[in-house]
Amino acid sequence: MEILTDVTIPKRKDETHKGDYGRILLIGGNANLGGAIIMAARACVYSGSGLITVATHPTNHAALHSRCPEAMVVDINDTKMLTKLIETSDSILIGPGLGLDFKGNNAMTFLLQNIQPHQNLIIDGDAITIMSKLKVEVPKCQNVVFTPHQMEWERLSGIPIEEQTYERNREAVDQIHSAVVLKQHGTEIYLKDNTYKLEIGTPAMATGGMGDTLSGIITSFIGQFDDFDYAVKTATYVHSYIGEHLS
């Protein structure tokens, strides 16, 4: 396992437009947990995403327009619109504030049925728990990354927290053919051919919404960078770097 000590964000080319920096779809935010998807959307915006659409519960629409005017907003229950958005997105994040009731299950199932092989999928929060409970296979799309904390990883992998060693985690990651950002003290980033560990970060980051922000940055960088692995590790490092310096 390599200690990640530095990253470089690629400079943008002059002759580009917003369509070159990701067509992002965020799915989440039920009637009680709208703040999670708003924070994820704001993280996407401030990380440089080109086009962002948020599918969320109607009670969150006014707050999203106010707090994140750069993002487009649709009703998560509008399956016709959601189908179109899934088809036209490059990268899709599902999970922040999604909820664990039947509506959350339905949204997760609907996405898994409609996602395309060329797309990137980021699975966070409640969506990880739903996948664990439903025991569904990881979709065969271009790239998949899970962003669990240790309890969510226990649900997904079956490995108790106290037994989450590098060796056991690596074996579980290889079985699901996905990248995993395991959030903890000394966050670990499991990619296809490499594993990284962070030594930056702070206990001040142990607060609500921190994971939603991380998933938003990861989604944003995946939409902008050509190299998936580099996007994931860079986003994770930047998130911890900012948290440490702001504290």
Indicate where each model-derived feature is located.
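Small-residue (G/A/S/T)-rich helix-start motifs and N-terminal tracts that mark the onset
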Residues: 1-120, 129-145, 154-247
